[in-house]
Each structure stands twice: as C-alpha cells, then as structure tokens.
C-alpha cells in the first residue's frame, strides 16, 4: 500500500505529524511519500517508511504550473490513500484529478473522508486523520531512531571534560536573542560553574544532526 501526505507548514508542524504517519505506515504496512517544503526534506528522510520526499513550495504561493507538476508526480504511483494537511481550492482541484480513492482532510470538496480534529496535544489529535483508514495512534509511544553517523559526529564535537554541557541553538529569527546575549550566557554560567562546557548549534544544521546533538547531551 502507498500513502501520500501533503504536508505544508513549518518545521514544528512537520514534527507533529511524524507519529501519525509512522503509525499509518506500520499498521497498514504502507510506504509513504511526503510533499513538503524542500527545507524539511532531511526530517522526513529520517522516517524509514518514507520512500520519497516531493519538494513543493506550499508557502510560496504556488502557481498553476506548480500544481500541474505535483499532479503529475502523484498520479504516476498507485496511491491508495492521501492524508491532506493542506487547504484551499487549488489543492482540492489537484486531488480531485488524482484518482486516489481515499483522501482524508479537515475540509475541501476533494476529500472522501473528513478528519474532525478535537482539542488536545497536536501529535495525538492528528489521530483524526487516521481513523477513516482504521489506524489508531498513541503519539506518546513514538520514537525516532537517529543515524549512527550523526550520533558519532555529535559526540566528537563535544568539548573535552566531564562538566555539564550547555547546548546553545540560536535561531536567527525575528525576536531571537541578540548575538551578544548568546555569547555572554556561557560565560555568565561559567563564572558560577567553572567546569561548564558549551556548544553552539548553527541555525542551518541539518535536523538529524541537531537532534543527535540533543540526544548526546546527557
């Protein structure tokens, strides 16, 4: 079985969808293809069931040509189901011509099954997208294995010593701390805790390497 996921949104939204798609793949014995912004490709390739990531500029006001290209990509494989996290007339028009028999969404004329999302923890409430396919979800049980090479790279990047490790992850986004605050924080803590070690994670660090750095900071 093949399942397509149309996944617009930021990195946080992609992370929230991981448990739901992993559950669908496991319980349906399905392979997955995910259409998302190209910047999120490295995240989805960490999920073993994802066989292909389709780059699509959901947030960049895609034109008719973009949608036509996406239609060509999703009509070629024999998808049995689509989890559509996108909204709007264009995506519904594209899906209505896709011949995918089951199309689950919160709204839209192209959906064949409706997902009624209740209030709650976002990863868990996305079970609403899975129920029409007979799939259950316990998002709290979801675990994602990290690549061994990313783990080893993270360990080797840690400063020598046995003191506590402080990870700093400047985002470089509006509202973030100014550079001098990030620079001064380790020194402020080190004045009270001389054995402190610190590592700054670059804002453009691939998500697998960022996750490995956190996992190794015990």
Label for each model-derived stretch:
Residues 1-218:
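Catalytic machinery of carbohydrate-active enzymes
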């Amino acid at each position: 079985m093949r399942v397509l996921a149309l996944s617009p949104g930021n990195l946080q939204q992609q992370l929230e969808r991981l448990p739901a798609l992993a559950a669908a793949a496991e319980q349906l014995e399905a392979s997955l293809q995910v259409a998302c912004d190209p910047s999120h490709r490295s995240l989805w390739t960490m999920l073993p069931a994802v066989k292909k990531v389709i780059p699509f500029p959901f947030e960049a006001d895609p034109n008719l040509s973009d949608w036509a290209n996406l239609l060509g990509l999703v009509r070629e494989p024999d998808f049995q189901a689509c989890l559509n996290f996108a909204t709007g007339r264009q995506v519904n028009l594209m899906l209505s011509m896709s011949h995918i028999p089951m199309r689950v969404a919160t709204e839209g004329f192209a959906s064949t099954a409706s997902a009624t999302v209740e209030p709650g923890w976002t990863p868990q409430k996305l079970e609403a997208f899975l129920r029409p396919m007979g799939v259950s979800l316990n998002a709290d049980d979801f675990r994602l294995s990290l690549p061994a090479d990313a783990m080893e790279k993270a360990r080797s990047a840690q400063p020598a010593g046995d003191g506590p490790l402080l990870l700093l992850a400047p985002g470089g986004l509006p509202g973030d701390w100014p550079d001098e605050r990030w620079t001064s924080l380790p020194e402020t803590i080190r004045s009270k805790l001389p054995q402190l070690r610190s590592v700054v994670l670059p804002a453009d660090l691939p998500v697998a390497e960022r996750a490995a750095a956190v996992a190794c900071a015990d």
